[in-house]
Regions:
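Extracellular (secreted or membrane-anchored) zinc-dependent metallopeptidases
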Residues: 1-174
Length: 174
């Protein structure tokens, strides 16, 4: 069990996915190798397989819980309406779907969970991690607003990147 950090089986016989654990990456026992993804349609390929199944289950192995709110799991991260739409949601597979498939982003709550879990894990053992010189974007501050419920609104934001990297904007309700 010491020769790998994470294990995940890919199949084509149906059954969906199961991480086998939450946050077990690099564990000393065999729980880190219990992940499986085998889509119901028997076609283990394409964006739907990669995002809705594989990355979702690996997200569990890295420490992320579900973000959908169609049922409360008492994890404190059930942030998204209905089935949710980000990677750790259940888009397209509940009776409260808001979209047929996930979008390829983690919710901020998932990122926070994974970032909190990884430093507690004993990996990568004996390896040196080299930080890059990439700098985070600088977000222009905006004032806070309170608007009445059901009021239509538009969100506008701006930021600059010290490295000149392209910027993608994403708003989440929290």
């Amino acid at each position: 069990a010491a020769n790998y950090d994470i294990g995940h089986l890919f199949g084509a016989s149906g059954g969906g996915g199961n991480a086998g654990c939450i946050g077990c990456v690099c564990s000393a026992d065999d729980t880190k190798g219990r992940g499986i993804t085998s889509p119901a349609d028997g076609i283990p390929q394409g964006d739907n397989f990669d995002i809705d199944y594989v990355v979702h289950e690996v997200g569990h192995q890295l420490g992320g819980n579900h973000t959908f709110s169609q049922s409360n799991e008492s994890t404190g991260v059930n942030k998204e309406v209905g089935s949710g739409i980000t990677i750790m949601g259940y888009a397209g597979i509940t009776n409260q779907d808001v979209a047929p498939h996930s979008i390829d982003v983690f919710h901020q709550a998932s990122i926070a969970q994974i970032q909190a879990n990884l430093p507690t894990r004993p990996c990568p053992a004996g390896q040196i991690i080299t930080m890059t010189a990439n700098q985070p974007p600088v977000v222009s501050p905006v004032p806070n607003y309170t608007i009445p419920i059901t009021t239509p609104f538009a969100l506008t934001g701006s930021a600059t990147d010290p490295n000149g990297d392209p910027i993608t904007y994403n708003w989440e309700q929290n």
